[in-house]
A protein has these predicted regions:
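Class I S-adenosyl-L-methionine-dependent methyltransferase catalytic core
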Residues: 1-160
Length: 160
């Protein structure tokens, strides 16, 4: 995680009014990291009720209102969300059948602001180099991250 955030600081200043979305947030470690790095707003989406409750409890303990935990299905959230974010992180289960659709859904629904960064954590067998928004791929041990960027030339406005 530390290595990833070191890379991300080349692209984003988390203390400069950044809004973030943490998808498949699990126990909320990325959401907590984003709040601690100065994000103005973090929406944390997790389906599991125990994980969601844990995130709520941690945010209460650290006395922050900068994280908004949402319990729900990530794909439904993506379809219904009308906000845009500077930074999106997704850590879906590696065996998720439609994992490879996540980047196109993020861009189709216009969730990322222009020049925003989307990071997808995934297994070694997923490849996204042909995606028009692909920036770079990083791997740290068995963990793989692909970074995507929203650019004005590559993006189509979301269809309603």
């Amino acid at each position: 995680k530390e290595n990833l955030f070191n890379v991300l600081t080349n692209y984003l200043d988390f203390e400069d009014g950044v809004s973030a979305l943490d998808l498949f947030s699990g126990t909320g470690s990325i959401s907590i990291e984003l709040v601690s790095r100065g994000c103005d707003k973090v929406i944390s989406v997790e389906k599991d009720p125990q994980h969601h409750a844990f995130i709520c409890q941690v945010m209460k303990e650290v006395k922050t209102d900068k994280c908004i935990p949402i319990r729900g299905d990530v794909f439904r959230f993506i379809e219904r969300c009308h906000e845009q974010f500077d930074f999106i992180f997704a850590d879906p289960p590696y065996a998720l059948p439609n994992l490879e659709e996540i980047p196109s859904l993020i861009f189709k629904h216009g969730l990322l602001k222009e020049d925003g960064i989307f990071v997808l954590e995934h297994g070694k067998d997923n490849h996204f180099e042909d995606d028009p928004h692909f920036m770079e791929h990083r791997h740290y041990g068995s963990v793989n991250f692909t970074l995507f960027r929203a650019t004005a030339t590559a993006d189509e406005p979301p269809t309603l």
